[in-house]
């Protein structure tokens, strides 16, 4: 009723299949369009690296586009490379004539590269939610980049969102707003 449209990107084939099934089962095909592609800082062909120690079945995560890196940017032992297309957010938004209101980004480590490929589109958004790892220089630089694009960040929200222990220590959603 509010004219909301969602454009989702899921490069991993099994997860993309589940995403499309859920869109169909919930009769949301008129509002949600899913693309089996990865976002990065260039348009073209690449690979999705699937790690040995990660779940490779439907719902699995922590796979990365192009770079053989884990979510924390440490080296990944890759067991499978799935061919994929990559698209920059700016290319997608221009080609589809989209001005995004809200963007959610969770690409398991390479968020800084997605931001670099989407500066024009990100600047037009009202809010951007990005899962970032505060242990990483690249992700702290991404926070600075978002601020340079005119976004604000609620440090209290970030502090509450950060994981307090385990594998994903200091990883959490950052809500940027104007």
Q: Where on the chain are the PLM-derived regions?
A:
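Phosphate/nucleotide-binding beta-alpha loop and adjacent structural elements of enzyme active sites
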Residues: 1-178
């Amino acid at each position: 009723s509010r004219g909301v449209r969602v454009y989702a990107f899921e490069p991993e084939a099994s997860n993309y299949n589940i995403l499309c099934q859920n869109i169909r089962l919930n009769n949301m095909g008129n509002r949600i369009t899913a693309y089996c592609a990865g976002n990065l800082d260039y348009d073209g062909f690449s690979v999705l690296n699937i790690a040995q120690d990660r779940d490779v079945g439907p719902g699995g995560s922590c796979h990365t586009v192009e770079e053989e890196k884990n979510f924390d940017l440490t080296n990944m032992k890759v067991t499978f490379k799935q061919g994929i297309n990559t698209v920059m957010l700016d290319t997608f938004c221009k080609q589809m004539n989209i001005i995004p209101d809200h963007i959610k980004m969770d690409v398991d480590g390479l968020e800084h590269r997605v931001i670099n490929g989407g500066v024009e589109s990100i600047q037009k958004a009202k809010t951007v939610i990005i899962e970032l790892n505060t242990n990483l220089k690249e992700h702290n630089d991404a926070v600075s980049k978002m601020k340079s694009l005119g976004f604000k960040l609620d440090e209290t929200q970030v502090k509450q969102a950060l994981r307090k222990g385990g594998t994903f220590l200091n990883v959490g959603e950052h809500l940027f707003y104007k």
